[in-house]
Amino acid sequence: MEAQFEALSELVKNGQKLNFGQDFFVKFYQAFLYSDRWQQYIKGVGTTLLVTAIALVLGVVLGAIVAMVRVGYAQQKPHHRNPILGIFNAVAQVSVTVIRGTPMMVQLLIMSMVIFASSRNFTMVGALALGINSGAYVSEIIRGGLMAVDPGQMEAGRSLGLNYMTTMFEIIIPQAIRSILPALGNEFIMLLKDSSLITVIGGKELLYAAQGVMNRTYEPMFPLLGVAATYLVLVMLFSALLAKFERRLAQSDRR
């Protein structure tokens, strides 16, 4: 196969026009097989999954903190509200509004060119930006799940002598988790696709690997199609796993 590629490449250098099949083979070989370029794509996939996982974990942690603050504030009686919690609630609301109301690309550029301008680890900066952005959306997912639990459950826990945090972690959250987890699965899929944005700031994920190949071959079609196909396969795989997980949750609810 390599010998055939070299022979066809020599014909191109000599000005000879290739037929469709030969041209297809040369471009495909250049994009994926020449100098083992497929390894760059594999490395890019690994980085993409790592960035997505880091962003999701960070998003869940930040989202849970924000959701707990907002739910805790909302559940206080109007004339007996903690002023400190009120400040945290206001900060949380403003943060969520700003993050959800501004483009992800702008947030990435601010993180890389302003906040972490001296950092050269663009991949981790991108993961951090994605995680903070995800936290705003995850907070609404978790808050919605917690608020969907019957308020009487909190009152019942408090009447048994449990404090707020114990009631929340032992009674409320276990009930809310069933509605929260499927939505978090969808957030993971969204993060997986959004991870391609970090290539703009130099994050070395899948699209970055494809751009490296394009810069050498001056042929964008196969690298970009390869990236699109890889993302499609990953999304379909995780969507199938998520659907299976949701079916199991539904079955357990019926028992």
Each predicted region: which residue ranges?
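Transmembrane alpha-helices and adjacent helix-loop boundaries
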Residues: M1-R255
